[in-house]
Each structure stands twice: as C-alpha cells, then as structure tokens.
Amino acid sequence: MNSSEIREKFLKFFESKGHTIVASSPLVPGNDPTLMFTNSGMVQFKDVFLGEDKRPYTRATSVQACLRAGGKHNDLENVGYTARHHTFFEMLGNWSFGDYFKRDALKWSWELLTQVYGLPAEKLLATVYIEDDEAFDIWTKEIGLPPERVIRIGDNKGGRYKSDNFWMMADTGPCGPCSEIFYDHGPHIAGGPPGSPDEDGDRFIEIWNNVFMQFDMAEDGSVKPLPAPCVDTGMGLERLAAILQHVHSNYEIDTFEALIKAAGRETNTKDLSNNSLKVIADHIRATAFLVADGVIPSNEGRGYVQRRIIRRAIRHGYKLGQKKPFFHKLVKDLVEQMGEAYPKLKADAQRITDVLKAEEERFFETLANGMEILDAALAGDAKVLPGEVAFKLHDTFGFPLDLSADVCRERGLSVDEAGFAAAMEKQKAAGRAAGKFKMERAVEYTGAGNTFTGYEHLEEQATVVGLYFEGTAVPSLKEGQAGIVVLDTTPFYSESGGQVGDQGFISAEGVQFGVEDTQKIKADVYGHHGVQTQGTLTVGDKVKAAVDGARRAATMRNHSVTHIMHKALREVLGDHVQQKGSLVDPDKTRFDFAHNAPVTREQILEIEKRVNAEILLNSDTQARVMDIESAQKTGALMLFGEKYGETVRVLDIGSSRELCGGTHVSRTGDIGLFKVMSESGVAAGVRRIEAITGAKALGYVQDLEAVIHSAAAMMKTQPAELEPRLAQVLDQMKALEREVGALKGKLASSQGDELLAQAVDVKGIKVLAAVLEGADVATLRNTMDKLKDKLKTAAIVLAAVNDGKVSLIAGVTADSIAKVKAGDLVNFVAQQVGGKGGGKPDMAQAGGTDASGLPTALQGVAAWVGERA
C-alpha cells in the first residue's frame, strides 16, 4: 500500500465516521507565536481545545504536514542516521471536540489498523496510563486485546501525572491520559516492550497515540474533570507506511525511495544506502514545504532554521562530490510524489526551485574554502574543533554551527560550543561598541531639549550641552575618540520617518568633530554621532554646526519624490496602496507598499510619467504645522497604525498631501529627473520600488544610452534603427534555424534508411536500437514515425546526444504493444543513462545525463524485447 493510498484510506475512514476532513495547515502556525513550526496535527486546533475558537464541526480528521527542526522539537542532527528521525513528516489525526470519547476513539483505531490496513492483531499492543482503568477495560473487555498486551505506564517523570502516558498542554490547563498503540516487529529485532529497560530498541514501534483531554489541572497539581472531554490522536504516516510496505526503515518507503533515487541521480551516487542521500531526501521535503509556506532563507528566526537545513543538505551533496547546485533539481521529484496531496506544493514548484537554487548558489561560493579550513583544523590529533574556528566558519563562510558539528560527528570529534558562544558574544559586544551611538537607551540625558533649525538653515551657531563617550557622559572628547555631541541648537536632521540622519561637522577654532549620523536620544534631543577628528571638544564650547549640504539636498530630492510617487501609485494601482515602510538616503528612495501583485512594466511607465509631470510643473512645496484634528480635515494622507502627536506637520508637494516631519525641496522642479530602478516583492502582499532622482537618474539614463549606441554600432546601424535591425537579424536567425532543421531532417532520414538494414528479428518483432548523429528530439520523432511505417511490426529505440545530454524516443507498432510497451522500453534504456521517462504504449520519450552508458544500453534492447515477446 503506497503512501497516497494510506492517506486516502485514513481520511475516508474517519469521514465515514462523521468527521470533517480539514486541510493541512501551514508549517508556520497562525495561532501560536510561541511555536516556531507546526509540529503536530493538533496545532491548528489548539484554540478550539482552549475554548477560544469554535468550529462548525465537532469531529475532524486531517493529514498534517509537520516540522521538527528548531527549538525544543529538533531532530536535525539525527536525520539520516536513524531509521525514523525526520525534519518533515506527515501526521494522520482525528479529533473530537466534546463529541465522542475513549470508547469510540480506541475502537475506531483498532478497526482502521486491523480491518482497513490489515495489520495482524497479534502484532499490536497498547499502553495506558496506570490510573486509566476505563481505557484498560475498553482494550481488554471490548476490543479483546489480551491483558498481557495492554501495558500500564506509571508516573515515570518524577511526579504525579508526570508520565509518558499522561499528556499536558502546559503546566496548567487541559490534560489527560493517553493510550499508545505499538507494532511488534518480532523477536529477531532487538528491544523490549514499552515500560521495560529495553524499550528504546527497534522491536516495538509506536504508531498511534490517542490523547484523552478529560481534566483541567490547577496550579497545585490537582485535576478536575473538563465539562466537555476531547480526543486528540496522531499517527506518523512514515512509520505506518514502513509497516504496511514491509520495510524496517522509514527511508525505505515509497516516497523516500523515490527521493533517494533522485538524490542519487543528481549526485551521481550509485550506493543508495548512503546516509547522505537520506539526509538530502529528508531535507528537500522540509525546505520545499517551508518555501511554499512563505519561509525564505535568512539569518534569523524561521528563516535561519530553513537556511540551516538547506546548507546541511548541500554539505552532504558536497561530501558526495557535488561542486555545483543540485539540491533544487529535486523539487520536481518531490512534486511527483506529494503534489497531488499538497496542491500548493505543485502550484509553487517554480518559486520553490528558484528560492532553493539562489540559496545553493550563495553557499557554494564559500563552501569549498570553508571545508578546507575545517579539514585543516581537524587534521592531526585534534579531538575538538576550537570554538574560534567554528565561529569563523559561521561568520565568514556561512556554516551553521550544527553543520560543523555534523562534520565533526562523522569523524568522531566534537565542537567547543562554549568557545563558539564566547566568540559570538565577543563579536556582538564589538558590534554594540561600534554602533553604540545607535543605541539611544545607552545614553541618559537630563537637560533641556534642543532647537531644530534645519528646515531653514544648514549652518547654526550653537553651544555644546552634552558629550558622551562609550555611552557615559564626559566633560570633553579628545582627538580620535568616537562619541556623541548634544547641542542646544542644531540644523542636523535626526533619522526619522525613513529619512536618514544628516552628516557634517561641528567645529570651533582648532577643534573639529565629524558627524557621521544624527539620531534622537529623546523626542526633542538630537545626538550627533561621530569622531573627534581635531583638538578637544568640551561641554560649554561655542561651535559652528554645519550640515553636508550636497548630501542633504540629494536626500531631500529622494524624500520629496517619495511623496509624489506614493500619490501616483494610489492613482495607478488603486486606493488600497498604503505605505509599509521606506528608506530615504542620498542615493535612492526605497518604498514598500501594500499591493497583491507585481507592478507591470506598463504601470511603472505610467507612474514615472505622472511623477515627472509633477516635477515639470515646478510647483511650490508648502509645510504647515497644526493640530491633528485640523490636519485630518485637510484630507492629508495618514498612515494606518502610525502614532501621531497632538501637533503635526502637513506637507503639500505637487498634488500630494501627507503628514511628514522630514526635510524637502522648495519646489518640485528641484527633484530633477525621476526613474524607477526596480520593483520586487518583499513579503506576502507587500511590494517594493527603488527609485533615483537628479544626477543619479541622469547618469543612469546616460549609461543606458551608451549601451544602446554600443549595441547599434555592433549591429552596424543607428540607435533609432536598432529595434527593426534586431528584428531583421532575429528573422534571419529563425530562417537559418529552419534551414538547419530541414538539413537535420534530411540527414536523419538518410540515416533512417541506412538503419533499416540494422533491424534484427526477435520472435517476429523487428528490433532496432541506434543513435542518430546531430538529431534533436523533433528529428528523432519524425524518423521514428518513418521507421515504424517501413518496419511494420517493430520495437524501436532512437537516441541522440547533444552537449552531453541523452535524448531517447521509443516506438512500438500497434500489433506489438500487447507484448512490449514503449514506456517500459524507453525506461529500460533511460535508467542506464541516468534518466527516466514515460509516454504512451506506442510512443515514449526520455532523457538522461550519462551518455557513457548509452552503447551498452542500446545493445541490451534486443535481449530485453526477447524476454517479453
């Protein structure tokens, strides 16, 4: 019974018992921020059990995709080395929300296992909580399981109700006994029954757990009955499949067998028992499903777990000799195995492939160098990988710690994890020191707020009222020291609303402080962060504060155009467009906004047209300060979720009116040219546009013009005539391709006539297996049709090799398909050249990657046909 049939039978069985089939929920839990990944079937029903949600059904069943690779539930290091550890697995489950209870749950479990799946009753045994007499009696008196095969499990975890057979959602709240069903693999397998000293052996394998939530536990450990007891059951699909398919390891079941073969194909590994293939097969399931559910590789949270799994798989491929991206190629094989059960996997196949390929390409850039360093560190008599080396591998080469630990474990060594943690903390401390001026809470300032004059002036006479070195107030800053300066008055704009802080200088005679950034210490106190480049600066000094004017002007252009672009986006795409984030600096504007589809090229052109039209109007910019109620009456655009004070600044730029405290151009014409550089998606329902203005935009256009002139020169035409000239050249190329195709057809036809004489008679069937030189797939197919017509009763295989890739076509005449199927024939050859294929009984196609096996494969065709004729 294959995995698809197991899923189908499970769901249909419980549907027949009045259960509603519920689709698998995403691997990212939508109702539990404390849980990194969905790790059991009950996760999507947690709110129902807690009484916080009510469903239109009281009985449910599902096949849930689960992941255990992070936090408390982490099987990553064991995956590939044991028979039953996985990162990704499927959980079959059924639930009762105050409906049926123990009797029905246990009886249905028994009925499904013994009557539907056909497991021998004598191979099954059960466990119950030591005080659960009700469950014991159901098993022994109603189901008929012999008492010696129902094992009572006591409090084996150090307290009352602390047992393998007593389930608790948390320290308090819903809880209850559970009854587990085990399968006995027989005395030839080492291990004892549950509850015995040898229970960790492989003889007795848990396949199903029935949890009965019937109590509410108080803080003092006492329990009282729940008003509506519930049932939560779970059975691992992979474990059940191993039993039903008569194999001992989960990695031998149908889905894994196919993926392991695919991993062997992509890594050119013939030994399919290699543990690295198991790792790769497991990890393609986990990573592909994670991408489908929106988890992209990153350096934090769920994204980092995803990155760790991908890179572990890549490292195992590297261990098998792979030096180029291979892992992403397994997505198509996974879709073949699981796409029907999980339609989202099938629908997102290309996106999943692209994400995995990009991560592979990134890691392969540093993998070889990192492995050299790791190998060198483990050479000789070393028993432990130094923590500093493990951290260097992590920080410089992208090696997650568990990847380095994986390599060490294979060699019987260990990693100095404490040393790694110390090195990590050292770097974080250095980062905090280098970026201390960004950490507002590290500076305590109790003086008066400063006056900001930067809307009107770029220079200001001021007095130093505060100095900070390493987060502590000091009377002076000496030359070479990095610190923070607070002035009573400042023209420097402090980072806010997406606009970066100003840079410039604070100076007096013989004294200069270079301002590298400006950040708020408090709402009305600006901290000027930088380095004392000359002399000593002292509290009370009279200074000149001067903003870098060119940098400020470039930033203002980009900030002002962001407002105009926001208005244009709403006009072109719709009023649903809403700002989700922005970054405005001297080089560009980056604007994130709510929109559920890519912005088309035509829409971008329209947005550019509208923005540049506003710029050409050269209208005045107007800023007004008013109370929030008055601002609302003006119709100014306000951002949902943004917190505004009682007094706000309303900014009119062109036809745009928004609340904004940033610095802006005086007239729209000051922006100059506006050009969109890129458009992309950054999250579900969020798009990002990056754009440039002024001299940057002009330079970009001039660079494009230079490329056009260069291309025109290559095509020996003028820039204005480049498009028709390219169309002409493409037409000529297509004509030449058709001519080449015709010549190939003639050549193949000639070869086909010559091949007729090579056909051999095998039990009345003309058998021909040959290579057509220089042929493509279309030529092979055309030649096949002609040969079938001429040979009449025949089984034919034609092959061609192009760029090391093998193309195969098998054809069988109608009077022979009862004995020989084209699909079987082409697969016989394809398997020997590293490929696979399929098709109809009379015509099938395949491809392969190992041309060296082709001669032998073709030589064996006649004998293969003879065995079936």
UniProtKB/Swiss-Prot annotation:
Keywords: Aminoacyl-tRNA synthetase, ATP-binding, Cytoplasm, Ligase, Metal-binding, Nucleotide-binding, Protein biosynthesis, RNA-binding, tRNA-binding, Zinc. Zn(2+) binds at residues 559, 563, 660, 664. It comes from the Bacteria. It catalyses: tRNA(Ala) + L-alanine + ATP = L-alanyl-tRNA(Ala) + AMP + diphosphate. Binds 1 zinc ion per subunit. One of its GO terms (molecular function) is zinc ion binding. Its EC number is 6.1.1.7. Its cofactor is Zn(2+). Consists of three domains; the N-terminal catalytic domain, the editing domain and the C-terminal C-Ala domain. The editing domain removes incorrectly charged amino acids, while the C-Ala domain, along with tRNA(Ala), serves as a bridge to cooperatively bring together the editing and aminoacylation centers thus stimulating deacylation of misacylated tRNAs. It is an enzyme of class 6 (ligase). It comes from Janthinobacterium sp. (strain Marseille). Coiled coil: none annotated. One of its GO terms (biological process) is alanyl-tRNA aminoacylation. SUPFAM superfamilies: Class II aaRS and biotin synthetases, Putative anticodon-binding domain of alanyl-tRNA synthetase (AlaRS), ThrRS/AlaRS common domain, Translation proteins. Catalyzes the attachment of alanine to tRNA(Ala) in a two-step reaction: alanine is first activated by ATP to form Ala-AMP and then transferred to the acceptor end of tRNA(Ala). Also edits incorrectly charged Ser-tRNA(Ala) and Gly-tRNA(Ala) via its editing domain. GO terms for cellular component: cytosol. It is found in: Cytoplasm. This is Alanine--tRNA ligase. InterPro entries: aa-tRNA-synth_II/BPL/LPL, Ala-tRNA-lgiase_IIc, Ala-tRNA-ligase_IIc_anticod-bd, Ala-tRNA-synth_IIc_core, Ala-tRNA-synth_IIc_N, Ala-tRNA_ligase, Ala_tRNA_ligase_euk/bac, DHHA1_dom. Belongs to the class-II aminoacyl-tRNA synthetase family.
